[in-house]
Amino acid sequence: MLSSILIALVAAGSAKAAGGLQGLLTVPETFPNLKACLSEPLTYSCENTTAIQNTCCSPTPGGLVLQTQFWSTYTGLEHKGQLLPKGSWTIHGLWPDNCDGSFEQYCDFSRQFDPAPSPAVLPNGTTIPAWKGPGVDTFVAKFKRVDLLDYMNKYWINQGAPNADFWAHEFSKHATCTSTFDVACYADYKKNQEVVDFFDAVVRAFKMFPTFDMLAAAGIVPSNKTTYTLDQFQTALKTQTGAVPYLGCGKNGTVLQEVWYFNHVLGSEQFGHFKPLDSTTKTSCSSTAGIHYYERTPSSEHEVRILP
């Protein structure tokens, strides 16, 4: 079945049809043409028994893909209109961990757009040069992706700095280490199209894991009074996804702050099918104390969903 989908995607990509196949399939014009992948064996990342020959077709070596999210209660820039989306967690990123759980970062300085790299120095002692050029939001605007920018400004929110700085950090630190976003994967490459491509992929993955709704389905909602157990959180999310994600907590493990969904991917991160896996990282949340899932400051969030 996936082969049929890939053929359709290739056809749509070749035609550069903004509306897809007679409107049935939408493929962003930034996505690469993946005809070469049709001859590659289909296997989930990190589950291949032979070496991946075309790393544009499967994230290699970073095949343990984490879709990560934050639960923040304020932005610090409310006075500038930078608000959190009501009824939703926010995007952190899409990370290409290696199959053994290790990871690379800032893999291509020629595509380093982070104005404040973190870390500023790599483990080997190399200093990461800070980006002094335009924000990555201008790259998205250049491709006329108003729809994408609008979504990112609603759901991919920074704390204490402009949203675009956060997006630049995530691309520079993580996407440059993800083989399916390599410039070499684009036969008719246009400058910065892989940046837009990555943002599309991040949004696509985020939509697969609606954390707020999955928790609410189990009766777990933000509260300044009620606490929940780690088991309640884990069970609620496993029931919906089939796997136990990483839950991150602050305040000695008693305040829920983030979630990481671990996956293997069949195909590229752009087109691929994500298969949820149990977290390979131990939770930082308490297994004994009650865990707070705090309400947001009312002035820090706004309605972004289309209500009936």
Stretches with model-predicted labels:
Residues 144-308:
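C-terminal, well-folded lobe of enzymatic/effector domains
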Residues 44-48, 53-56, 64-67, 114-117, ...:
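Extracellular/mature segments of secreted proteins
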Residues 72-74, 96-97, 101, 178, ...:
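Solvent-exposed loop/turn segments at secondary-structure junctions
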Residues 36-38, 45-47, 55-58, 98-100, ...:
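Sequence contexts marking disulfide-bonded cysteines in secreted/extracellular proteins
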Residues 85-90, 99-141:
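Active-site-surrounding "flap" and adjacent substrate/cofactor-binding loops of secreted or lumenal enzymes
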